């Protein structure tokens, strides 16, 4: 999210901002800040397969180096962009346009990593159907991991090795493609311990979430195929494209100003700035010069040779 002027907030956010505040100089606990407008961020790239298994992913989380360390493949031809102004559907359409440009014959599998937002998933499926594109939606595995941590805090003492072991054991089972088993096991644990409805709420929420999205959580097949299972590229893009420039202390942006900055930073990070600048200067020349003449054809200039220079002869 980016802090913008009140007039540039979405209507729902403006309504929250209009609620009375207890203090004039700072927010109190629980009061909505209601100062930010959320950006939609997208990235399209190609990456070579990197076959892994659940155990190697868990080892990576534990920062355990493998016996034979190999260089991980890096994203290629990566293009990124973000928008505060345009609707979600427009950003998704641009994402599909770029994917089509990179793979016009659709020889490669198209994977779309999402963070669990239902509106985002619905919009992607709708656009894919309209374009006749076959895409595989994948839920960010790290996003699923956060639900396990929230549930684990209700079953294990916070900050203990038992909590970490409980979470990682179930995360490994998620990576093995056993989302339904994990959901059922968590609910049984809550029932056996006799937790109240309020105490077990995070457990039931996580279980319901996994069951509803188990079709997006075939991590065992994805790891075997060597495809990504997490949105690390998007997380990095959010930091470098948005936060490093727009989320600075004391900044409050206009919508048009923030959108312009996002476009320029996206061009730089995607390696397209030189092409854009050549196009920009050509259009500026046309607007300020060529368009002022009939038929937009400036008269040819008679080029003169260099003027003779005077020399002091002694």
Where are these regions (language model features)?
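Catalytic center-proximal scaffold of phosphoryl-transfer enzymes
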Residues: 1-314
């Amino acid at each position: 999210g980016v802090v913008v002027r009140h007039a540039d907030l979405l209507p729902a956010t403006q309504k929250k901002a209009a609620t009375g505040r207890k203090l004039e100089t700072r927010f109190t606990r629980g009061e909505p800040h209601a100062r930010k407008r959320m950006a939609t961020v997208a990235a399209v790239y190609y990456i070579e397969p990197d076959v892994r298994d659940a155990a190697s992913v868990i080892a990576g989380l534990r920062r355990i180096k493998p016996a034979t360390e190999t260089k991980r493949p890096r994203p290629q031809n990566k293009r990124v962009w973000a928008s505060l102004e345009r609707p979600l559907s427009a950003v998704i359409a641009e994402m599909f346009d770029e994917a089509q440009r990179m793979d016009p014959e659709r020889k490669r599998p198209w994977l779309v990593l999402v963070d669990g937002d239902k509106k985002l998933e619905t919009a992607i499926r709708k656009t894919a159907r309209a374009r006749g594109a076959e895409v595989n939606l994948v839920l960010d595995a790290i996003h699923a991991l956060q639900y396990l941590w929230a549930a684990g805090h209700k079953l294990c003492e916070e900050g203990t090795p038992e909590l970490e072991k409980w979470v990682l054991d179930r995360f490994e089972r998620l990576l093995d493609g056993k989302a339904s088993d994990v959901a059922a096991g968590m609910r049984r644990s809550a029932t056996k311990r006799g937790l109240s409805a309020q105490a077990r709420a995070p457990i039931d929420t996580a279980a319901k979430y996994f069951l509803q999205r188990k079709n997006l959580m075939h991590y065992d097949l994805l790891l075997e195929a060597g495809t990504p299972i997490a949105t690390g590229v998007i997380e990095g893009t959010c930091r470098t494209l948005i936060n490093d420039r727009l989320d600075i202390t004391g900044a409050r942006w206009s919508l048009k100003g923030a959108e312009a900055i996002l476009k320029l930073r996206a061009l730089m990070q995607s390696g397209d700035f030189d092409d854009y600048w050549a196009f920009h200067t050509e259009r500026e020349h046309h607007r300020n010069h060529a368009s002022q003449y009939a038929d937009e054809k400036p008269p040819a200039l008679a080029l003169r040779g260099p003027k003779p220079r005077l020399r002091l002869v002694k």
